[in-house]
Amino acid sequence: MNLKSASQLTLYGLNDHFNELVSLYKKKKLPNKILLSGNKGIGKCTLAYHLINFILSNDEEFPYDEKNFTINENNKSFKLTINNVNPNFNLIDVASDKKFIDISQIRNLILNLNKSSLNKKPRFVLIDNIEYLNKNSINSLLKFLEEPNDNIYFLLIHNNKRILSTLKSRCLNFKIHLTNSQSAEVLNCILKKKILNNINNELIDYYFTPGKILELINFSNDYEIELENLTLKNFLRILIEKNYYKKNIFGKALLFDLIESFLQKKEFHIQSNLFEYFITKINDVKKFNLDDEIIINEFHEKVLNE
């Protein structure tokens, strides 16, 4: 199942947000520094790609279908974008072999933007996971954002993690939110079936955005894990005891997400003084790139096997 935001032809659930941004653009009031903030997997990046295609395809063949919130796969700008050769589009994200967005990525971006444009169309910079900008990357980006940038739009994707206030203050913040019922509707549209009937409600309650559930489904299919009657606690046991979290990058991210969800359960929070301890340890592992095996084994022993 293809989960890449760039190739999602139809926008689901975020139509009102899209219309608001399009309305600002048509009135020539669209800010050139926009922060799209919300839970990871909610569709912020997909929304950004649709807005970009709407603008770039406006004077091209097979333009964006505004009525049905759909990108035409035959559109020139769409083809250039998914093949990473669109001169009017720059994507910045964490490299597969890195844990943070490196300053070299920002420097190369600035060099590219300082070059003359090949056409008169707007240019777009999409920075995903901006919470992974390191200090040097942020400082370099801030200097460029302070300068006048005619016809260049920055769309920054923020996953509700803490970011530098100086970066946040330079952008107009659009908060993206979906209710559980809206998320369920989005999933049903994408999958063409009611897949949530096959997932334990406890997992849904603690892991519920469309993108995250889709990743969870893919992961469970890869390792033949039945989710229908699986509690959150037992799922954590399986991930750790069978070392599934070591199989790929998503597996480890999934494990830490679910550990945090489990720790934030009200009954656990009240009854255990380990809550703050493990949350602090997990944050330190992520922030300082520490050995995560120690904290995972400790969590398994002190919490899951209590």
Where are these regions (language model features)?
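Conserved Walker-type P-loop NTP-binding/catalytic site
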Residues: F78-L91
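A short hydrophobic beta-strand->loop->alpha-helix junction that borders the nucleotide-binding pocket
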Residues: S37, L91-S96
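Conserved alpha-helical scaffold flanking the Walker A/P-loop in AAA+ ATPase domains
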Residues: N19-Y25, N75-T81, D102-F124, Y132, ...
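Structural recognition of the conserved hydrophobic beta-strand(s) that form the central parallel beta-sheet
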Residues: F124-D128, L141, I152-H158
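Charged, glycine-rich active-site and insertion segments that engage polyanionic ligands
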Residues: M1-F54, E60-T81, D150-I152, N160-E306
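Flexible beta-alpha connector loops of hexameric P-loop NTPases
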Residues: S96-I103, F174
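Residues immediately C-terminal
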Residues: D97, Y132, E147, R162
